[in-house]
Amino acid sequence: MNPHDLEWLNRIGERKDIMLAVLLLAVVFMMVLPLPPLVLDILIAVNMTISVVLLMIAIYINSPLQFSAFPAVLLVTTLFRLALSVSTTRMILLQADAGQIVYTFGNFVVGGNLIVGIVIFLIITIVQFLVITKGSERVAEVSARFSLDAMPGKQMSIDGDMRAGVIDVNEARERRATIEKESQMFGSMDGAMKFVKGDAIAGLIIIFVNILGGVTIGVTQKGLAAAEALQLYSILTVGDGMVSQVPALLIAITAGIIVTRVSSEDSSDLGSDIGKQVVAQPKAMLIGGVLLLLFGLIPGFPTVTFLILALLVGCGGYMLSRKQSRNDEANQDLQSILTSGSGAPAARTKAKTSGANKGRLGEQEAFAMTVPLLIDVDSSQQEALEAIALNDELVRVRRALYLDLGVPFPGIHLRFNEGMGEGEYIISLQEVPVARGELKAGYLLVRESVSQLELLGIPYEKGEHLLPDQEAFWVSVEYEERLEKSQLEFFSHSQVLTWHLSHVLREYAEDFIGIQETRYLLEQMEGGYGELIKEVQRIVPLQRMTEILQRLVGEDISIRNMRSILEAMVEWGQKEKDVVQLTEYIRSSLKRYICYKYANGNNILPAYLFDQEVEEKIRSGVRQTSAGSYLALEPAVTESLLEQVRKTIGDLSQIQSKPVLIVSMDIRRYVRKLIESEYYGLPVLSYQELTQQINIQPLGRICL
C-alpha cells in the first residue's frame, strides 16, 4: 500500500462525524435494499464484533462517565441490529437463504430438534428481557431520579468547599461539569434502556413472523411439504433470532454493567474492583469453604467435586487471612513508632504539640473556617420543610440573585437545631446572626392588606415584620384554595424561608464579594476579553477592584455587566486614585442600566430632589482626612434634615411607584450613608447617572 492510500485512510479516520453519518444512512438502506448472503454474513460478524468490544469497554472503564456516549451508541446499535433483522427476514422469506452464519447458528442451536431450538431461543430472550434489561432499566430510572434530586445539594457542597478554600475555581468548575454530565447520562440511560427492551420484544415477534411466513411461502409458492418447509425455515428463523439476540444480550449486559457501576476515587476496572472487594473478606471465604464441605457430605451429591471446591475456597480464605493479619501487625508497629514520642518519625513531624501530648499525631485541632451562609431552623420544622422543595427554592433564589446582582453567592447550609424556640429560624452570615423569623405550623404567610382578607372572610393572625415596612399575616392552610382563587399571594414555609433569605442576601451582598470572588469573575471573562483583563489589572490593583465591586453591589447595582465596569476602570483608573470617587465615575458609565432599573423600563423616573441650600450644607460638612472623607454635620442639623426627609417622603411601603432621590455627584455617597438606616430601600442617584432620554417626575423637594 503506497503512502497516498495511507494518508487517505488517516483522513477518513479523523472524520468520525462523516463515518457516523454514513453508518446511519447505511442502516436506512439496509431496511430497503436486498443484500446478498455474503454481505449479510459480514454485517452479522460486524454486529457481533461491536457487541463484544462494547462489553469489554464496559468492563475496563473506571467510571460510567468515561463512556457517556453509551446511550447514543445503544440507539445506533439497536437500529443496526433491527435493520439487520429486516434484511435477514427478507432473504429468508424470498430465497430461503440468509447466509452461512445464520444457517450454522440455527443448525447448531436446533440440533435436529425444532422444539429444543425454540425453547433455547426463548430462554435467552426472556433472560435478556425480564432479568437483565428489566433490572438495568430500573437501576437507570432510580439513578436518574436520585442524580437529579441530589444535584442542588451537590452544587451547594461544591460552592461551600470553594468558599472554604478546600478546592480552587478550576476544580469547582470541573466538579460542576461532572455532576451535570452524570445527571444527563443517567437521564439518557433511563430512556435508552427502552431500546434494549423493545429490541427483545421485536426479536420475539420476528421469529414467529419468519416461521409462519416461511412455512406459508414454502408450501404455497415453492411447493415444499409442510414438514420440509417447517424444518428449513425453522433452522433459518432460529439462526436469525440467535444472531440477533446474542449481540443484543451482550449489549444488555454492557448496559447493566454501566448503570450498576459504583464509581469512587480509587476505582479501576470492574474486574479489579470485584477482586479487591472479594479478597478483602477472607472470613467469608473460610465460612464458604466450610459450607461447601458440608454440601459434599450430603448423600447423593458429588462429594469429590464439592471437596475440591471447599479446599480451593478454604485455602484461599486462609492465605488471605494470614496476609491480612501480617499487614495489620505491620501497620500497628508503624503506628506505635509514630506515636511513641521518642521515635525518629515523630520528631520529624510538622505538627506542633505541647505538654503531655508532645510528639503525638492527631492531637492538634484542625483549622476550620466559619460557614459563609447558615440557616438554623427549629428541628420541629424538619417535616414541614420538604427537602426537595426547599432545595429547589434555595437554588432558584441564588440563581435569581446572581442574574440580578451578578454576585456568586456561596452554598447555603441548613441546620436543624433542637435548642431553638418553636418554629424559629435564624439566618447567619459567617456564623453571626443577621436576621431571624418564625414559622407557624399549619399556616401560610400572606402579604396582603387586612381589608382584602376581611373582605374574603379569611381569619388571620398578625405575624412579625420579617422585613421593614412590610406587614405579614398568618392564615390557616385550610384557606389555601380560597387564597388561590382570589389570586392573593401566599407563601409556604419553604418559600417564607427563601423569601426572607433573598432580602438578607441582597442587603449583605457586598460581604460576598472578596478578592477571591473578584479573581473568579476576572477568570470567567479572560477567555473572551483577555486584553481588557490584562489592561485593567495593570491599572487597577485587585484590592481596589474588589472595593469598587463591593460599593456597587452594596447599593444594589448589578456587576453582571463586567465589561462596562472594567472599561470604566481602564478609562478613569489612571486619572482618579480615590476608590470612592472612582466608583462614582463607574456608576455614571452604567447610567443606562441604572435608569432602566429604577424607571422600570419607562422613560419617567419619579424622584425627590434636594434643595440647593441643603446640598451646600452637606457639602460644607464633608471632611477630608488621610484615611478618607466623611460627613460631619452637627447633630441638630442631621436630625433636622432627617425629619424633613421623613415629612417629604413619608412611608415608602405605601408608595406604588418606587421613587429615587437625586443629588449632585460629589455628595451622593454621603447622602446615601446619611439616610440608609431609615430609608435603605430608597436609591440615591446623581445627575450624571441619568440618560438624556429619561424624564424626571419631581415628587417633592427636601428643604431645611
From Swiss-Prot:
<keyword id="KW-1003">Cell membrane</keyword>
<protein>
    <recommendedName>
        <fullName>Low calcium response locus protein D</fullName>
    </recommendedName>
</protein>
<dbReference type="Pfam" id="PF00771">
    <property type="entry name" value="FHIPEP"/>
</dbReference>
<feature type="transmembrane region" description="Helical">
    <location>
        <begin position="200"/>
        <end position="220"/>
    </location>
</feature>
<dbReference type="InterPro" id="IPR042196">
    <property type="entry name" value="FHIPEP_4"/>
</dbReference>
<feature type="transmembrane region" description="Helical">
    <location>
        <begin position="235"/>
        <end position="259"/>
    </location>
</feature>
<feature type="transmembrane region" description="Helical">
    <location>
        <begin position="108"/>
        <end position="132"/>
    </location>
</feature>
<keyword id="KW-1133">Transmembrane helix</keyword>
<keyword id="KW-0812">Transmembrane</keyword>
<dbReference type="GO" id="GO:0009306">
    <property type="term" value="P:protein secretion"/>
</dbReference>
<keyword id="KW-0472">Membrane</keyword>
<comment type="function">
    <text>Could be involved in the secretion of the yop virulence proteins.</text>
</comment>
<dbReference type="InterPro" id="IPR001712">
    <property type="entry name" value="T3SS_FHIPEP"/>
</dbReference>
<keyword id="KW-0843">Virulence</keyword>
<dbReference type="InterPro" id="IPR025505">
    <property type="entry name" value="FHIPEP_CS"/>
</dbReference>
<keyword id="KW-0653">Protein transport</keyword>
<dbReference type="GO" id="GO:0005886">
    <property type="term" value="C:plasma membrane"/>
</dbReference>
<keyword id="KW-0813">Transport</keyword>
<comment type="similarity">
    <text>Belongs to the FHIPEP (flagella/HR/invasion proteins export pore) family.</text>
</comment>
<feature type="transmembrane region" description="Helical">
    <location>
        <begin position="278"/>
        <end position="297"/>
    </location>
</feature>
<keyword id="KW-0997">Cell inner membrane</keyword>
<feature type="transmembrane region" description="Helical">
    <location>
        <begin position="304"/>
        <end position="320"/>
    </location>
</feature>
<feature type="transmembrane region" description="Helical">
    <location>
        <begin position="18"/>
        <end position="35"/>
    </location>
</feature>
<dbReference type="InterPro" id="IPR042193">
    <property type="entry name" value="FHIPEP_3"/>
</dbReference>
<dbReference type="InterPro" id="IPR006302">
    <property type="entry name" value="T3SS_HrcV"/>
</dbReference>
<feature type="transmembrane region" description="Helical">
    <location>
        <begin position="42"/>
        <end position="61"/>
    </location>
</feature>
<dbReference type="InterPro" id="IPR042194">
    <property type="entry name" value="FHIPEP_1"/>
</dbReference>
<keyword id="KW-0614">Plasmid</keyword>
